[in-house]
Every structure is written in C-alpha cells, then in structure tokens.
Amino acid sequence: MLKYFGTDGVRGEANKVLTPEMAFKLGRMGGYVLTKEKEDGGQARVLVSRDTRISGEMLEHALISGLLSVGIEVLECGVMTTPGLSYLVQAQGADAGVQISASHNPVEDNGIKFFGSNGLKLSDAKEEEIEELIDTKQDMLPRPSAEGLGTVTDFRDGSNKYIQFLENTIPEDLSGIKVVIDGANGAASAFISRLFADLDVDFTTISTHLNGLNINDHCGATHTARLQEEVVKQGAQLGLAFDGDADRCIAVDENGNEVDGDHIMYVIGSYLADHGRLKKDTIVTTVMSNLGFTKALERRGIKNVRTQVGDRYVSEEMRANGYSLGGEQSGHVIISDYHNTGDGMLTGLHLMLVMKKTGKSLTELLADFKEYPQVLVNVPVKDKNSWKNHQAVVDAIDSVEKDMAGNGRVLVRPSGTQELLRVMAEGPTQEITQEYVDRIVKVVTTEMGE
C-alpha cells in the first residue's frame, strides 16, 4: 500500500497536505528516479505544467526547484491540460513530465502526477521507489553545483504543437454542428477558442473566465447543470464539458440530457466498428460501466472487457492486448490510435466527427442504448478491505445476485481514498435496484459499521 501516491498521483489540500516542502521532495526524488538511468549520459529533460488553481504556481516553483537540484533541465509549459503534457513529453523526446493538478477536485486541493518518457503514468513500483527516497532519514541524492545544476526553459509555446496534433486527428472541418463548450474554468479554457475556431465549429463557451479560484466550481464534467440549460436555451446540437485538467469529457445531447463516458464510447466505438477500425471489436471499460452498455454492445457484435477502477488499468489492458478504445463512465476516454491517455478535447472532437459523418443527432446515435437504473451507497466501515471475510456480507450479495437471475449486477468494492465500502447495483427498475442495495447495506452496516 503506497503512502503518498493514490490512484492518480499525489493529492491533497494545497499548502496543508500537499505543501511546497512536499512538492520540492517530489521534484527532487521523483526527478532522480525517472532520469537516473538516462542512457546517453546527457542532461535529463523534464516537462512541467499545471492547471489554473491559485496554488499551482506555488507548487510549480517548489517542484521545479527540486528538479533543478538534481541537475535536470526543466521545460516550463505553464498552463496545460494533462493529456497535452503527456503528448508533449513524447513529441519532445523528454525523459519525463510532471503535471500539477487535482483534476476534477475542488480548488482547495492540488496534485502532482508524474509521466514517464512514454507519456504514461508511472507503475506502482516506480511510485514506491520515489516514496522510499522521500521517507529516507538522510537525503543521499547527488547535489551538483555550478554547471551541474539544472536550468529552466520557457516552453509555453508547446501548446501550439498540442493544438496542431488535435487538429490533425480530424480529417475534415466540423462545420454544421452547433456546440456549447464548458471549460470548467480549467486548463482547457486557454485552448478551446483557438482549437474549435480552426475547425470551423459553430460554438459558444461557458466557464472559461479564469481567476485561480473558480476551477470546477459548479461547472465542468462533474457539474453539468448549467451546460444542460445552455444547450437547450441556445438550440445547440451538443454540449461538451471538460474537467479541470481536461482529461475527461462529458457530453450533453440536443435535449439537454447528460451523456456520460459509457454513452460516448458506445457512439465512437459503434462508428469505428462499422468502418472496420475498432481493433478486435472490443471496448475496454472498468467494472463501473453500466450493464446496459455491455448489452448494447453485444447487440452490435462488440465485446466489452472490464478492468478494476482507474484509467491506468484501462490503459494497461489496452496496451497489453492491442485494443484501440477504452475508458471510464466518468468521461476518461482513450482513443489509442491517436493518444495513449484519456484526452477530453480529443474525445469531444471525435464525438462531433461521428455526428457529422453520420448526419445523426446524439439521441439517434444512442437509440439502442438502454441504461439500467443504478444505485450506489457509500457505507462507512471500520475496515473496508475485510468485507470478503464477513460471511454474512458475502451471503447477502449472493442472495441478491440469485434474485437478479441475470437481469442485473452487484459490485462491492472499497473506496480508494476513504474508509468506505461502496455498494452498487444495477437492475430492471429503480425501485427494485434500491431494494437490492438496501438489503446488502443493512448487512454491511451490522457486520462492519463504525
């Protein structure tokens, strides 16, 4: 069990949990681990970027100081999306990248996420190596001086390369589709107008007024209410919402209904399959994807491979078996023909491309997708990882699954960040599904409750 790194890097309340001191250590120790085996013996290069949080610059300066202290050349990208940084690390042939962002979390939080030279998140083993160095009582890492110290190069124009990359994935303009775009007052906000104007999109934007304090504040991929209203009000065919670092995309259809990652993958995957471009006719998702998604894919002859929760695990499964599309219900979508990580803006563009190529609305494209009602309850418990040892809990789950008779599913899993057990079920109706969950929750509370 890692001490500092969670499922998406190191996160916490900025200046209290994630302090400048910790950022310095992460820069120093992380930079060393990622560049110590540089084969050509030259100076290592690491790209650093951040989202729009007020704490970003504070942590950025501390992190960069740590990198410089072990002799690393830093390319400072300024405000950049997380997938944008991942792309630039590969495009520049850099040794690593570091993104300062807490993604969809509130402004009080921030995070530090490392990428290897391949633009991918680090393995658990690499993160563990960094943690061991952080916790070592005496810092024995190299301390170069004079010409051995690292330097900083301004690389804010790297955003131009990233935008050009996104545009090059679209074979034609996207004129004829009216779209409202929610930038979450985050990293994508700086690039939306340039990107969508270049592709002749008829678009308006909301939540792109940056002040360092309003990122994800009742906007973006986790708060789509305003976007839903604007799509209907403006008579748009589509709404696109990104989160703070734009690795997610959630859509809104022409009627103002939210369209999550499952639905987006269904639309893009169906189009790719119809044109022989969905590798192995398979879409990779996590265990959280709706049962209706799997059944809709089956009707189209598309397979659904599931992993544990986390886009890292989706990405690993895709790379290991040569799949080309995968993601999460939350809006992380990986289109590996173009990028090896979830990219909200790339996802939004390709959703629009399917609409233009088919001449269909989102409602029409999703006509065969019948979502199963889902109920999720988070139960406070004493030991979230011990639930399988409680026979009464196991029996309650088995009883519910037997009653479902194949027309539903149960998923019980520990929270990745809190002492909670998540009990989720999907079934034929909301009422029946709620009853299923209540039965399990009652037993969990009795057996494991605080």
From Swiss-Prot:
Cleavable signal peptide: none
Cofactor: binding details: Binds 1 Mg(2+) ion per subunit.
PROSITE patterns, A to Z: PGM_PMM
UniProt: Mg(2+) binding residues: 103, 243, 245, 247
Processing after translation: Activated by phosphorylation.
Source species, domain of life: Bacteria
Catalytic reaction(s) noted: alpha-D-glucosamine 1-phosphate = D-glucosamine 6-phosphate
Keywords: Isomerase, Magnesium, Metal-binding, Phosphoprotein
Keyword Oxidoreductase appears in the UniProt entry: no
Class of enzymatic activity (EC top level): isomerase
Enzyme active site: 103 (phosphoserine intermediate)
One GO cellular component, as annotated: cytosol
InterPro entries: A-D-PHexomutase_a/b/a-I, A-D-PHexomutase_a/b/a-I/II/III, A-D-PHexomutase_a/b/a-II, A-D-PHexomutase_a/b/a-III, A-D-PHexomutase_C, A-D-PHexomutase_C_sf, A-D-PHexomutase_CS, Alpha-D-phosphohexomutase_SF
BP GO annotations: carbohydrate metabolic process; peptidoglycan biosynthetic process; UDP-N-acetylglucosamine biosynthetic process
Residue list for modification Phosphoserine: 103
GO molecular function: magnesium ion binding; phosphoglucosamine mutase activity; phosphomannomutase activity
EC number assigned by the record: 5.4.2.10
Family assignment from sequence similarity: Belongs to the phosphohexose mutase family.
Role summary: Catalyzes the conversion of glucosamine-6-phosphate to glucosamine-1-phosphate.
HAMAP family recorded: GlmM_B
Protein name: Phosphoglucosamine mutase
Originating species: Lactobacillus delbrueckii subsp. bulgaricus (strain ATCC 11842 / DSM 20081 / BCRC 10696 / JCM 1002 / NBRC 13953 / NCIMB 11778 / NCTC 12712 / WDCM 00102 / Lb 14)
UniProt gene name: glmM
